[in-house]
Amino acid sequence: MLKEFKEFALKGNVLDLAIAVVMGAAFNKIVTSLVQYIIMPLIGKLFGSVNFAEDWSFWGIKYGLFIQSIIDFIIIAFALFIFVKIANTVMKKEEKEEEVEENTVLLTEIRDLLKK
């Protein structure tokens, strides 16, 4: 049973997923700090409020924090979109290379059959 678990845990997909989760958490911290400490203070200065996230509230509802979370989400979603686009481009190139090899093999077999 331990051997089966080890084989499962060391499969490429499981390791890739584990690495992606760790990297995603780290990336989330980077984007959150970028939004919280750089972008939101600049937006706060534009609107005349020193702390946009905390000062923009109405009846205890902190709209500034909500807007900060939206900006955070947009940055992460855009970064993931770019990553997926790049990954898809790389995968398509690999598929085209495989097609060429498969076609070459088939043509070689046809040629050999025609020689007989």
Swiss-Prot record:
Topology class, membrane: Multi-pass membrane protein
Gene3D superfamilies per the UniProt record, alphabetical: Large-conductance mechanosensitive channel, MscL, domain 1
Keyword terms, alphabetized: Cell membrane, Ion channel, Ion transport, Membrane, Transmembrane, Transmembrane helix, Transport
Pfam families on file: MscL (PF01741)
GO CC, one annotated term: plasma membrane
SUPFAM superfamilies: Gated mechanosensitive channel (SSF81330)
Subcellular localization, as worded in the UniProt entry: Cell membrane
Keyword Iron: no
Primary location class: membrane
Membrane-spanning ranges: 7-27, 64-84
Any one GO molecular function term: mechanosensitive monoatomic ion channel activity
Domain of life from the UniProt record: Bacteria
Protein family (similarity comment): Belongs to the MscL family.
Subunit structure: Homopentamer.
Function: Channel that opens in response to stretch forces in the membrane lipid bilayer. May participate in the regulation of osmotic pressure changes within the cell.
Record's protein name: Large-conductance mechanosensitive channel
Species assigned in the record: Staphylococcus epidermidis (strain ATCC 35984 / DSM 28319 / BCRC 17069 / CCUG 31568 / BM 3577 / RP62A)
